[in-house]
Every structure is written in structure tokens, then in C-alpha cells.
């Protein structure tokens, strides 16, 4: 994936054609949201001419700037600067208007609020080439999990209300949301050991992705085929990759796992250099026993 605009500053598009020729399969400015609709329209129109996928972060930066939590009971009780769920809806509706104008292939990286879902559903019903994702954290945690300003739970967008979390689970189940992502965002210890408002957002998630997802399975929200469709097949299809499926001639990228294996999450056992997981100390189920990439075994769990 390559940047959509130079320096990801939202003002001038990158050399999308050259980057695509070099192997870029999608274009995004990640968390940075441009307020220059004309610049983004030009970038989308050019991406459309090349059949490229544009990935955006639906958010109104004017409303969300400086926020550390979602507006609601928790932020009010703790006195934390908060962002309204309307910021996500407004950002998404702007993006979808530009998609309608340009016809570009579009993916919303994180939908986390119930208020954004109607706009997404309308766009799909209208035949726009749009997909959307949400993170495993927004499917399994809510605003009150932050507790006493626990910075490992500070993510972007912030954790939402329980009503929003349940709405996201239902949206994955009915296909309104296509992709569940890890949104793996490492942060060093020093950037997390700060007052909540000053701490860096983000959480490591690659190693906790599967056991966290198993919470949805064990709670009866999603069966395994639906879960892995959203975690593997749908993102691979959207990116035009051959992975994410068990099929003849498909890459043998496989995992062997026990969905019921219980364990206590200890962040110091993570292989990642960063240890900022919100699941530290949590009782979890679902262990990866072995991993193959391209038919070669690259991991085996300790017995």
C-alpha cells in the first residue's frame, strides 16, 4: 500500500501510476484525513482511471482533533476530551459523495459507530464500489474497558459504547461490514506510560487477533466460516490477492489452531518488540498451533 498524497498531507496526489507499476495495490493516507476535497477528488479520479483501490479513514478532523475518548458516559465521568460519533458519520458521508462523483474503488478502513452504518448501507444498495472494515478491538471492547485511564486501551478511533460495539458485531454478521482487521499499531513503553490524554494511541494485535476473534465465536455472534471470511477471504479479495482461501492452486498460507484452548494472556510472552496489548492479563481461548507460508512451516507452538 502506498500513500495517496505526498507526505500524506492531503494536498497533492502522489505518482499513483508509477507506484502502481512498482507494485502498490492500494493507496491511503492512513489516519491523516484531508480537508481539501478538491485534492482528494483528483486523487480518486486518477485512481479510478487505473482501477486502483483507495483506502480512507472516515473522520471529520475538525471534530475529532485532540480527542482521546468517545463522547458519552465514560468521557463525562473521567473528564476526557471526547469526539462525537457524528465525526465518523460526517467523514464517511463526505467520502461516499466523492466516491459517487468519481466512481473509484473505495474501502473505509474503520467503521466503529452505529451512526455511520446507514450511509454505508445506502452506498452499497446504490451500487457504489465500496467496502468497509472494523477493528477487532472495536468488536470485543468498549469505552468502559479503559477503566482507570489504562493507556493500553487508547486506540484510534477511541473505543466506543457497548451499543456501538454490538452494532458493529451485527454489521459484520449481516455483511454491511466486510472486513475485520487487527489494526496492529505498536507503541513503545515510554509513549504509553503517560497521562491518558498525552499517551500515544494504538495497540499491538497480530498475536492476539485470533484469540480475540474467538470471543465473537464463543459468544455465539459469528460462526467460524463467517469469522474467517471477514478476517481473510474478504480482505484478500478486495486487494486482489490469491490468499485467504482453501482452494487448489491457491497459496498454501495456513494455520492450525485449537479454538477452545484456554490461556492467560501475558504481554511479556508476545514476540512483538512492543507489548502494548489491551488484553494483558485476560483469559482467552484459541491458540495457533502451527503456521505455514507458501507451504513452508514457519511456526510451531511450544508443547
Regions of interest found by a model, annotated:
Residues 77-105, 152, 173-174, 178-180, ...:
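His/Asp/Glu-enriched, well-ordered alpha-helical/loop segment
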Residues 195-198, 251-303:
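C-terminal cap of metal-dependent C-N hydrolases
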Residues 37, 64, 117, 140, ...:
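Glycine/Thr-rich phosphate-binding loops of Rossmann-like dinucleotide-binding domains
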Residues 113, 137, 185-187, 261-262, ...:
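Short, glycine-/Ser/Thr-/acidic-enriched flexible segments
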Residues 11-180:
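Histidine/acidic residue-rich metal-binding segments in metalloenzymes
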Residues 1-12:
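Metal-cofactor-binding active-site regions of metalloenzymes
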Residues 131-134, 182, 208, 291:
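Ser/Thr-centric signal marking residues that sit
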